[in-house]
From Swiss-Prot:
Residues 134-159 are annotated as: Disordered. One of its GO terms (cellular component) is cytosol. GO terms for biological process: trans-translation. Residues 137-159 have a biased composition (Basic and acidic residues). PROSITE patterns: SSRP. GO terms for molecular function: RNA binding. Its main location: cytoplasm. The lineage of its organism: Bacteria, Pseudomonadati, Pseudomonadota, Alphaproteobacteria, Hyphomicrobiales. The gene is smpB. Pfam families: SmpB (PF01668). This is SsrA-binding protein. Belongs to the SmpB family. Signal peptide: none annotated.
């Protein structure tokens, strides 16, 4: 157990959507729980998951994670889970209403950024509210990243 004064925020990241920050302008992020079966949690503990092509949508007052890939748990018997099933996200009613309003009114998207285990061992999903970037915005981001890399190289040489 950690000492009382120290704040420990250890997050074991299982899956990350690395393209999301390049393809979308992130406005806000939320932490959501996931409704999972036992074999899905065991599969996540092995560190095998993919959320690169997944997205979230609102249906019937609830937020669902769609097209996320959690491979079958190899040690499970015939009661294994489906790899690409829809998974319910656990958010407060206020957060659900806020997300639904932003998606419906402002045309924003719900993008899963990463799946991780929090310090209590619970599976969490970092969900982002974002707007899709245009092609010229993506080019600008790429140029800015290249310039920062080059600038750091020059500063390192001058020392």
């Amino acid at each position: 157990m950690a000492p009382k004064g120290s704040e420990r925020t250890v997050k074991k990241v299982v899956a990350e959507n690395r393209k999301a920050r390049f393809n979308y302008e992130i406005v806000d992020t939320y932490e959501a729980g996931l409704v999972l079966t036992g074999t899905e949690v065991k599969s996540l503990r092995e560190g095998k998951a993919n959320i690169a092509e997944s997205y979230a949508t609102d249906e019937g007052g609830e937020i669902w994670l769609i097209n996320s890939y959690l491979p079958e748990y190899l040690q499970a018997n015939r009661f294994n889970h489906e790899t690409r099933r829809r998974r319910k996200l656990l958010l407060s009613k206020r957060e659900v209403n806020r997300l639904q309003g932003a998606v419906n009114r402002e045309g924003m998207s719900l993008i899963p950024l990463r799946i991780y285990f929090n310090e209590r061992g619970r599976v969490k999903l970092e969900l982002a509210l974002g707007k899709g970037k245009k092609l010229h915005d993506k080019r600008e981001t790429s140029k800015e990243r290249d310039w920062n890399r080059q600038k750091n190289r020059l500063l390192k040489e001058r020392g």
